[in-house]
From Swiss-Prot:
Keywords: Hydrolase, Magnesium, Metal-binding
Function: Responsible for the hydrolysis of cyanuric acid, an intermediate formed during catabolism of s-triazine based compounds in herbicides such as atrazine and polymers such as melamine. Catalyzes the hydrolytic opening of the s-triazine ring of cyanuric acid (2,4,6-trihydroxy-s-triazine) to yield carbon dioxide and carboxybiuret, which spontaneously decarboxylates to biuret.
Positions annotated as active site in the UniProt record: 156, 226 (nucleophile)
Species in which this protein is naturally found: Azorhizobium caulinodans (strain ATCC 43989 / DSM 5975 / JCM 20966 / LMG 6465 / NBRC 14845 / NCIMB 13405 / ORS 571)
Protein name as it appears in the record: Cyanuric acid amidohydrolase
Length: 356
């Protein structure tokens, strides 16, 4: 029976794969079992954040040395931006085989890749449907049949550049936007609605091109979408609970109502029978509230011309969550279009369950 393992590895720079290399060398991680790697890299998290691609390239070089062509199947999801005290790190998701003493259900991992997304489909229903189909494939790969057993879906999605817009126009097509920064939000939003569609959180007849990044009453409680320049398709990882997996690890999720709402994290830990600590894995989304207020108090994250609002939000939310779990290697991704309510966002906790 498969056993899910999650390894959190600190990095000294985006290309620092020495920790992963050492874990492979000592046998702590079997490269053949690596399904996905999430990373927080120290870039700006915007269009011109090449720290993500730098990390992906470095990881691919290492993995190909151990896995050959199979390395291309590993989902590499790099999220740029380690603002505030957030510490750069990798999360390595591994599938092992064995007979764990812990009874099922347990943490299950599934992954899927999509073909390259036509540039004119980005931020439109074509992207929504492409992501929804891939989420369903990833669920099947994880052995999850009930969408209620899915607790977190991570999607790495593409963005538009000036050259990509021109390429579409040369074919007689039009893109949803020519603003490259805005394209990041549209891509995240369409991907999130694709997740919501796959999980039954939003009905397909409620969706159209017009609602993407417009009707924020439509959102997923389990979506985390990160856009980047380093890919043209989507890489999708589903994390949930399955009777077909065993082992000590389990996952639970909640939705933060705002940037300082840490109650869902505590509730998730309680649901797992786990305590906060160094071993706790936290995955979260962050987005400044569009109202410009947090519990009635004014914030200035939307008014800073020097620093992107998503960068402010990542730092703020990571600090709040670090205070709960007691460490700063937290995966907080910025840009929460259709990912949780305005100013809040999905959060998931992975921890070892208390035996007995």
């Amino acid at each position: 029976m498969p056993i899910a393992k999650v390894h959190r590895i600190a990095t000294a720079s985006p290309d620092d794969v020495s920790g992963l290399a050492a874990a492979i060398a000592t046998g702590a991680i079997a490269p053949a079992g690596i399904l996905a790697i999430f990373g927080k890299t120290e870039g700006n998290g915007c269009v011109n954040d090449f720290s993500r691609g730098f990390a992906v390239q470095s990881l691919q070089m290492l993995l190909r040395g151990h896995m050959g062509a199979a390395a291309d199947e590993v989902c590499l999801v790099m999220s740029g931006g380690t603002e505030g005290g957030m510490s750069p790190h990798f999360l390595v998701f591994e599938r092992a085989e064995g007979n764990a003493p812990e009874a099922a259900p347990a943490l299950a991992i599934g992954r899927a890749h999509t073909p390259d997304l036509p540039f004119e489909a980005l931020g439109r229903m074509g992207q929504v449907r492409m992501v929804a189909q891939a989420v369903r494939r990833a669920m099947a790969a994880a052995g999850i049949t009930d969408p209620e057993d899915v607790h977190f879906v991570q999607v790495k999605c593409p963005l538009l550049t000036a050259m990509r817009v021109k390429e579409a126009e040369a074919r007689g097509a039009t893109t949803a936007t020519s603003d490259t920064l805005k394209s990041m939000g549209l891509s995240r939003g369409a991907s999130a609605l694709g997740i919501a569609l796959a999980l039954g959180e939003v009905a397909e007849d409620a969706l159209s091109d017009a609602v993407i990044c417009a009707d924020y009453g439509l959102w997923s409680a389990r979506a985390s979408c990160s856009s980047g320049i380093e890919l043209l398709g989507h890489e999708i990882v589903v994390l949930g609970m399955s009777e077909g997996w065993s082992g000590p690890l389990a996952i639970a999720h909640g939705v933060m109502a705002d940037a300082i709402d840490v109650t869902p994290v505590k509730a998730a830990l309680s649901a797992l029978g786990a305590e906060a600590g160094e071993a706790t894995i936290v995955l979260a989304k962050a987005e400044p509230s569009r109202s410009g207020r947090i519990r009635g108090k004014r914030h200035t994250m939307l008014d800073d011309s020097d620093i992107s609002p998503t960068r402010h939000a990542r730092a703020f939310v990571a600090g709040a969550l670090a205070g709960v779990v007691g460490h700063t290697e937290i995966y907080v991704s910025g840009g929460g279009e259709h990912q949780g309510p305005d100013g809040g966002g999905p959060v998931a906790v992975i921890a070892a369950r208390t035996m007995g």
